[in-house]
Amino acid sequence: MTNSRLEKLAADLQRILGDRQIDISCALGELTLLVHSRDLPDIAEVLRDHQDLGFDTLIDLCGVDFSEYSTDTHAGYKREDRRFAVVYHLLSVKHNHRLRVRVFAEDNEFPMVDSVMPVWPSANWFEREAFDLFGIIFNNHPDLRRILTDYGFIGNPFRKDFPLSGHVEMRYDPDQKRVVYQPVTIEPREITPYVIREEQYGREEI
């Protein structure tokens, strides 16, 4: 969107939402709206139903783990006190507007936000995916269960503290004639590239 359209949309959001919005920022030609988790259900309805907004389509929803998000590893970005966020990407077909909405879960140990399925039914599988991969609970979701990992999977693989090798591995046991689980046998290791610091290395002597 052009700068003038972004500025108008930001002004409309501030006017319509008032104190219910925490922050509106613009980067790379997109607006990001930050709201409290307690206000999410009401704000979602306003974003969809208000004639000046009309965000009738939820394009995508994802979870984010900010536990290792700091100025030490991500220059120019502020670390958040709250660990988990849910990010929604919305589209207004009528006005041809796009909006990113970010909501932080208040509890780092048991992250929970309200489901937006009553407003955007397409959130169904998106919320199940965020639940499966990040362990974020979506209140009032009618069928909140894993969608990508196996039924007996332990943990949430997109959390920063989840081991890269996982906890268990599965294989086919010819004796039992079925797939079995066993503790992972891969040993974690750090691979450091070998750097040769000789300035003339590899040059043939003339």
From Swiss-Prot:
GO cellular component: plasma membrane
EC main group: translocase
Cross-referenced InterPro entries: NADH_DH_suC (IPR010218), NADH_quin_OxRdtase_su_C/D-like (IPR037232), NADH_UbQ_OxRdtase_30kDa_su (IPR001268), NADH_UbQ_OxRdtase_CS (IPR020396)
This protein's record includes keyword Lipid metabolism: no
Domain of life: Bacteria
EC identifiers of the protein: 7.1.1.-
Subcellular location(s) of the protein: Cell inner membrane
Molecular function per GO: NADH dehydrogenase (ubiquinone) activity; NADH:ubiquinone reductase (non-electrogenic) activity; quinone binding
Function: NDH-1 shuttles electrons from NADH, via FMN and iron-sulfur (Fe-S) centers, to quinones in the respiratory chain. The immediate electron acceptor for the enzyme in this species is believed to be ubiquinone. Couples the redox reaction to proton translocation (for every two electrons transferred, four hydrogen ions are translocated across the cytoplasmic membrane), and thus conserves the redox energy in a proton gradient.
NCBIfam families: NuoC_fam, PRK06074.1-1
Name this polypeptide is given: NADH-quinone oxidoreductase subunit C
Naturally occurring in which organism (per UniProt): Nitrosomonas europaea (strain ATCC 19718 / CIP 103999 / KCTC 2705 / NBRC 14298)
